[in-house]
Amino acid sequence: MASILLSIKPEYVERILSGSKKYEFRKRLASKPVEKIFIYSTAPTMQVVGEVQVVGTISASPTALWEQTKGSAGITRDKYRKYFKGCKVAHAYRL
């Protein structure tokens, strides 16, 4: 299993580290199975601030993925839909 470094906006970093955001959404997954994500908080923080264990991944249509994850998504539906606009498949790392 691999470890990866992901750039994440500070508002989402806080939610991940507090445990209220249990999914990290991505348009693509890493090519190898991921065991750990090192979190790089983007501007204004601009540094690695922590790490989280990955317990699995989910891939589905954006609508189906939202229905599965919305309770602990840590993101508004509007921002989620904007991020995945035009995508046929959406992915999430389960944290």
Task: Mark where each language-model region is.
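Structured alpha/beta reader/binder surfaces that contact nucleic acids or chromatin modification marks
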Residues: M1-R94
